[in-house]
Amino acid sequence: MRSRWSRIAAVVSAVTVVIGMTACSGSGDSDELLVYNAQHESLTKEWIDAFTKETGIKVTYRQGGDTELGNQLVAEGDSSPADVFLTENSPAMAAVEKAGLFADLDQGTISQVPPQFRPATGKWTGVAARTTVFAYNKTKLTEAQLPTSIMDLEKPEWKGRWGAPPVKPDFQAIVAAMLQLTGEAATAQWLAGMKAGGQIFQDNIATLRAVNDGQVDGGVIYHYYWFRDQAETKEISNNTALHYFKNEDPGAFVSISGGGILNSSKKKDQAQKFLTFITSKAGQEVLENGTSFEYPVASGVPANKALIPLEQLQAPAVNPSDLDSQKVTDLMTKAGLL
């Protein structure tokens, strides 16, 4: 049986869902916000339900992927009907920011999130976080045999033994962090090693399933896919464990899910309230107490008790505004991974 998260992952993208309404009418009346949502749908629905209950402001959302919706916003420019953009990863936020499409956030919203989880520009903010991990099959690898660094995976001894989903924005964000931290030459070499010796999978779930089934010894994914399956059926994670690279390794990259307000929005006050709520204690407790298993980023809100605390991950310092999605696409295409 496929897990609930597998079914969610299979839902067709780019559909418009309406909260508290029977039909979607774009950005609608003065109290209704339109969110372009690339974050997981179930989490955003929890945020919207809680926000509408507290404020009475109705919210609609258009579901899609990071790259898809980011490119759509850039194409729409000042004519976009969107009021808010939410993503799973930072590169799409950086692309929209570089296009000059974000409005400044209120200082009150910005101050709720520590500097390491938002860009210094104040054009958008982190709303959640997820960490890179190496999921490994416990029957194939001991802890002593695990790679010290994610960079080790391009070495000959790992050929054919690991995999990842290069077509997904999640993995591309990891490569963007690698590019920022190690430079173009090292990143290109690593991608060439992946092409020569890594197994290619459709997404994080398929990667984890392949590790669990013993198709590969290990795989690079985001942590919460493992925790979600562990909390449900353990169908695709029962034979696996997680390895955290730590030591400020590129493989310890913590990816920031972002939220920003579009300059073109005619409902900036309501949009500010929405982002202020998401990053408030009440909004972040949805992460702490829910089953998304993503990390809260607001000050004073701990992670779900099942997770390793963020401060213990020893993540490298990365500037989220400088995660270069276009350069990553170019490098991955040149390596034959896209």
Label each region the model flagged.
Residues 19-23:
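C-terminal motif of bacterial Sec signal peptides marking the signal peptidase cleavage site
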Residues 25-27:
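Bacterial signal peptide processing site
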Residues 29-47, 62:
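Extracytoplasmic "Venus flytrap"
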Residues 38-45, 67-68, 74, 80-216, ...:
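Extracytoplasmic ligand-binding site segments that recognize negatively charged/polar headgroups
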Residues 91-95, 218-239:
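A ligand-binding cleft/hinge motif common to bilobed small-molecule-binding domains
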Residues 130, 158-165, 191-194, 200-201, 236-263, 277-300:
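Periplasmic-binding protein-like
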Residues 135-140, 179, 254-267, 286:
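A bilobed periplasmic-binding-protein/Venus flytrap-type ligand-binding module shared by bacterial periplasmic
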